[in-house]
Amino acid sequence: MILIEDLTVVSQREIAPRIFEMVLKGEMVADMQLGQFVHLKVPDPSKLLRRPISISEIDYNKKEATIVYRVEREGTAILSKMVAGQTIDTMGPQGNGFDISIIEAGQKALLVGGGIGVPPLVETAKQLKAKGVEVVSVIGFANKNAVILEDKLRACGDVYVTTDDGSYGIKGYVSTVIDNFDWTPDAVYSCGAPGMLKYVDSKFENHPHAYVSMEARMACGMGACYACVVHVKGETDAKNLRVCEEGPVFPTGKVIV
């Protein structure tokens, strides 16, 4: 069920240049699932459209959820100035999220993230670990300064970090690491830039439990405006799915990334 609630800002901090981590508190948290997102209304009357931001962590006991976002334009810049005690008009939780019911204790999951696509993998990793699943994360960034959330993922399993320029971790891309694995994961969960998702979609196209979480510009966020559609593969007629409703998570091989 999609709700609208004024969530309270518990804390906010900059964890990397232009990347902020905000903790929100409210009753809505009880309905949140890993891989979903919230739609935030910027506290400025001139900003009409909400901002979709993925949920990074969920603490059901405290009724707190953590989001991580990058300051891109004026709207997110305004969000970055919010402080503890302020409230923000929030619609959510939205989207289908990651399905971890298909993997069992003792099996192995591969998490693949790039840049600001890494945050939703944190709660996924935590819940997989709690389930007894072996978690391996491969995360890619432009450079050392852009690396985020490595410590939280490392608390859940092995982590490989790549940077485009080699300033931290392994020089290259997530594919540089994954293509050298001599094992096949029982499930794959990914979120990141289109180029990275194209790689995951191709690499694991025929995998029965591989998923890509897609980003898209949204307007209404409720499936009515069709501003966030993606195209279904193999359809002769134009068939679209909405990232905000049928997504943001899709099985590999399902949609054109």
Curated annotation (Swiss-Prot):
Cofactor requirement: [2Fe-2S] cluster; FAD
The protein's annotated pathway: Pyrimidine metabolism; UMP biosynthesis via de novo pathway; orotate from (S)-dihydroorotate (NAD(+) route): step 1/1
Top-level taxon in the UniProt lineage: Bacteria
Binding-site list for FAD: 51-54, 68-70, 75-76
One example GO MF annotation: flavin adenine dinucleotide binding
Cofactor binding remark: Binds 1 [2Fe-2S] cluster per subunit. Binds 1 FAD per subunit.
Entry's Gene Ontology BP terms: 'de novo' UMP biosynthetic process
Domain FAD-binding FR-type: 2-100
InterPro entries for this protein: Cyt_c3_hydrogenase_gsu, Dihydroorotate_DH_ele_sf, Dihydroorotate_DH_Fe-S-bd, Dihydroorotate_DHASE_ETsu, FAD-bd_FR_type, FNR_nucleotide-bd, PyrK_electron_transfer, Riboflavin_synthase-like_b-brl
Pfam families (alphabetical): DHODB_Fe-S_bind
Chain positions recorded as [2Fe-2S] cluster binding sites: 220, 225, 228, 244
Alphabetically ordered keywords of this record: 2Fe-2S, Electron transport, FAD, Flavoprotein, Iron, Iron-sulfur, Metal-binding, Pyrimidine biosynthesis, Transport
Record keyword Membrane present: no
Similarity remark: Belongs to the PyrK family.
Function: Responsible for channeling the electrons from the oxidation of dihydroorotate from the FMN redox center in the PyrD type B subunit to the ultimate electron acceptor NAD(+).
Subunit structure: Heterotetramer of 2 PyrK and 2 PyrD type B subunits.
HAMAP family per the UniProt record, alphabetical: DHODB_Fe_S_bind (MF_01211)
Protein name per the record: Dihydroorotate dehydrogenase B (NAD(+)), electron transfer subunit
Organism: Streptococcus thermophilus (strain ATCC BAA-491 / LMD-9)
Lineage of producing organism: Bacteria, Bacillati, Bacillota, Bacilli, Lactobacillales
Gene designation: pyrK
